[in-house]
Amino acid sequence: METPRASLSLGRWSLWLLLLGLALPSASAQALSYREAVLRAVDQLNEQSSEPNIYRLLELDQPPQDDEDPDSPKRVSFRVKETVCSRTTQQPPEQCDFKENGLLKRCEGTVTLDQVRGNFDITCNNHQSIRITKQPWAPPQAARLCRIVVIRVCR
């Protein structure tokens, strides 16, 4: 036979376990995936860029096989390409087509996977051939225009 006191104690434990179970998934849900963190970095690139069109993720290198700590910086390496969407359209990059002969940028740096305090330290270089020069004494070479864009967002 169960006493009222034992029943009350069992009810409290059940309530504590329920609350603990509800709290744990929300804590782990605050960690971004590697891809999500890179997409946020691309969004920051688009926000801070002064160029007329926005960029979209083209290629993402493999994630590092590090620890799963969302607060520790993760090395990232990816390429973005210019889209046909203007900065003024406010359209998500994923809905924009790549621009034919659009600029390509190689981006590297670190991101943290913490959804609330996500940090990005990304450097992007664009490399695009702009002309072929031919001199009588040398083989043709591509002249390259390089520009470095640095993104540092700390929250």
Curated annotation (Swiss-Prot):
The keyword Signal applies. Residues 30-143 form a propeptide. It is found in: Secreted. One of its GO terms (biological process) is antimicrobial humoral immune response mediated by antimicrobial peptide. Its main location: secreted. The modification Pyrrolidone carboxylic acid is found at Q30. Keywords: Antibiotic, Antimicrobial, Disulfide bond, Pyrrolidone carboxylic acid, Secreted, Signal. Disulfide bonds join C85-C96, C107-C124, C146-C154. Large granules of neutrophils. InterPro entries: Cathelicidin-like, Cathelicidin_CS, Cystatin_sf. GO terms for cellular component: extracellular space. This is Cathelicidin-1. It comes from Bos taurus.
